[in-house]
Amino acid sequence: NSNHRVTESRVQKYNNLVKDVPNTKLYASIDSWGKQAEYIRHGLDIEHFEANLIRLLAQGIPVGIMCTYNFLSIDNISEFIFKMAELKTQFGDLLTVDMPYMVEPLHLSAQICDDSHIHIMEESLKEMELYPFTTGEIEKYRKTVGWIKANRFKGDELVKHRKDFWAFVKEHDKRRGTNFKEAFPHLGMIGFNNET
C-alpha cells in the first residue's frame, strides 16, 4: 500500500521490478481529493500523488485506490469521484476504486453526519453512476452510503462523538499547523458547525 509520496525515480524503480511479474497490483490510500485529502493525510502532496499515480498507470501497472470513507471524505467526495472517473476513462480497468466505510475512530466516522451530509452522499452516488465505474464499485459505495444512513449516531452518543470530533480538529490544527476551516470551508457552514 502506498501514498505515492516517493520520488519519480523510486516509482520508476518499482515499475522496473514489477513490470514482468504477473498479477501485480499496487494499492494506494486516499480519502478525498485536493486540499481535503492533504488535510486528512498530513504531508500528502496531491499533485505529487496524482503524478505518481499516472506514471504507474501509464506504464500498465494496475492500481487499486482505497478510500476509507469517513466524515472528512464527505465534503469533497464529488471531486474525488470525478478525478477517479477521469483516470478510469484514460486508463480503463487498470484503476479500481474501493470505498469502504470507516468504523473507528468513532469521532471521525461518517456516523456523526447530519441530513445535509447524507444529501451530499446520495448526490455523489448519483454522479458516480454517470461515470465509467464498474457495477461492483458503485454497489460498494452504495453499501457504504446505506450503512452510514442506517447507523448514524443519535442522542448522547452523537453529541459525544461530535464534541470529540471538534476536539480532534482543534488539536490537529494546533499540532500540525493546519487550518480546518481553510481545508473544509463548506463543512464548517453546514450541519453541526454551531457546536464548535
Question: Over which residues does each language-model region extend?
Answer:
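Short, well-ordered alpha-helical packing segments
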Residues: 15, 50-54, 81
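Catalytic cores of alpha/beta
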Residues: 71-87
